[in-house]
Structure formats: C-alpha cells, structure tokens
Amino acid sequence: MKKTNFTFMAFASGKESTKDNAVKRYTGVAPVFVLAVNPNKAELEKLYNTQLENDPEYLGEVEVGGDKHKVQNVRLDFIVKTDAGKCGGIEFTTKVAFFIRKEYRYNRDQTKVQVIDKYGRTAWVTVEQAKAHEIPVYKNGPANIDKDYRPAYHGEEELTNFIKAYLNIPNVMKYVNNTWVMVDKPEDCEARLESIAEYFKGNFKELRDVIALQPNNKVKVLFGVRTTDDNKQYQAVYNQMFLKNNITDYSKLDADLQERKAAGAYPTTEFTVGDLKEYDVESTDLSNSGAVGDMPFPAGDTAGGTPWDFGK
C-alpha cells in the first residue's frame, strides 16, 4: 500500500498566552479621592501607569442652538480613585468630567437665565430681574437665593455641586421653628467659582487650589456602564448629583436618577444605586441555541465526506 505523507499547516507563530487583560467596569456608589484636575501628559501617565501618544486636549468648540453657532468649550477632568477600604476591596482610577461652555445658561426661549449666588445656589430669573438683582417669587414663595448672584455658565451648576459635596460645605440655611433661617456663620457656606473665564485660556489653578483645601476628602459618586451602538462598553459617571462622604441614604440620588431616565436621559447607561460592584454581562446560553437544521452546514456525525479526503 502506498504511504502518503502530507504537510497541512499554515499558522503564524502566535503570541505567548498571558493573564486576562480585560478591562473591568463597575456600577454603584463609591467614595472617591480626587487625585488631579486636568493633568498634563506626564501626570496622566503616572496616574494610570501607562504611556500616552498625545497630550490631553481640554479646550475646544461645540455647535449649539438652532443656528449651530460655535461656542468655546472646556472639559474639566477630575481624576478620582476609589477608597478600596470602603468599596469591598475594589480600587480603580477613572475620571469625573464636566463640560463648561463659554456662554450663560438660558431657558429654551431665552426669556430666563440661570443665576448662581455666593453659596452655590441657583435659580431662574428673567433678564430684567437679573439686571436688577431681584429675588424671583414662585408659587411657594421667594427663591432660595441671595441677591449677590450672577449669571451661571452652562455646566457650572453640576461642577459647583461636585465641589460642594467634596469639600463637605454645609447648607447656608437651617430649619428653626418651622422656618428656614440663615446659619450663624454663612461665610463657612460660600461656594462659588470666580475665575471660570480663565478655564477657557487653559488656566485651571482655581480648581486645583479648591481641591487642595481638603486633599484627603472624599466624595460619593454613582458609577455606571455605557454601551455604544457597536456594543463597546465604557465606564460612566452620573454627574447630575453627588453625595457628601457621610451620606448613607441614597434614596434622593435614586429618585433623581429615575426622574431623569424617565425623561429620556442616559438611555444606554446602566446604573445601580447601591454598593459598588463589578459589572457583569449575563452570558448567553449556547447549549440549546438552535436545531441542526438551523446550522449553515451539517452536524459532524451526519456530514458528508470532506473535500480533503486524501485516503482515497
């Protein structure tokens, strides 16, 4: 019998198998430290223990409004790290990002502008009221804001709320005898950024100085996972509300999240209002995924002869 030897191999050498380098994602509420604000390339490489090709770009432009006019925009990245001791051993570094536009925030028909006072409180007033520094009166009474207010930049409210929670700044009002009154030392409650115009020039000293006031403080952040149309997943942050580190009741945070999601916000992001945990996508059960007839070719035990049947 004729003996036939065949060499049937066309493989590259491949790579040595190593440990799984899949990036983990997390959901839940976690206390975090703030490590840096808008760091440069060298600082980012040290924070993330990696090498970067390009310098980070924090300044840009966005098109807004029906007329698509361009407005200068700045991204503010607060690099944060979870407190592993309070997160079941989970430790990771990520960022909380804010976007500030170089324009004041108006309502849709441009009849009202958002204003912010020196205690970080906001309200909506008419343009005429803003010019006169009037306190607007709502159905339930006057707005909870001081006359010393100014127009707020688009995105400033969320940024201010983050800083107030991080610095653990108290409320300027207290409830006494069924009435809200100002605290005895309102100066301890001041919380307003005054150099935002400098951010659009690349000067972030004010923010770095603010964080340095309490370098060991923590703020609680709600993390989630965002899924893109091509099924890629990214770590996300709910930046509409932040909690002081001593807060353990998350009901207001959950209510705020549900209200915004009901209005159409965060449609592709999954949040879990609770303890921080690793995000786990349920695996698909392929053991009974279809009958043999659904396959593009016959099953192994019923298949015909292979076209490479060299034994014949």
In which residue ranges do the predicted regions lie?
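Short beta-rich binding modules
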Residues: 1-312
